[in-house]
């Protein structure tokens, strides 16, 4: 945990998050294999207002303006270490209050983005050039999110699966009753 504490930095300009994003990211990093974080200097939590004017106008390779993206992975270049930026204001922009208040949903929301960006970093350090960048990052994020969910919330599987089966049973019964009522008319 101490290694991950120094890895996460906050750099906001005139912005205060409604939740402790740093703590959320630190929790998520505990489920990342240490070798996948090799050569990664920091994970910077920031907002788009903290971007310079020049960087706000920059575009991603997909054509999206940098001011609209959720995260970005910067690789080692000209002696500068690799780091990841997460744009917290963009991530939380359309999120409902109950998604923020429930740690499980908040963790899943940030896990998808953080693990995706770490996936870009892992692809570079592992020289996995055969797979397209976004495909590799998405698969990596899905694998780590699944691992995180099973280890952190595994106890819910024993509770939720039977509950879902019961709910689906009720839904089938309701549909059958509706069909019979429609036939009688």
Predicted features and spans:
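Active-site recognition of the HExxH zinc-binding catalytic motif
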Residues: 112-125, 137
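Hydrophobic (often cysteine-bearing) scaffold residues that line and stabilize catalytic clefts
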Residues: 21, 111, 133
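Short conserved catalytic/interaction loops centered on acidic-Pro-aromatic/His motifs
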Residues: 124-135, 152-156
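An active-site-proximal "capping" alpha-helix that borders the catalytic cofactor pocket
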Residues: 132-147
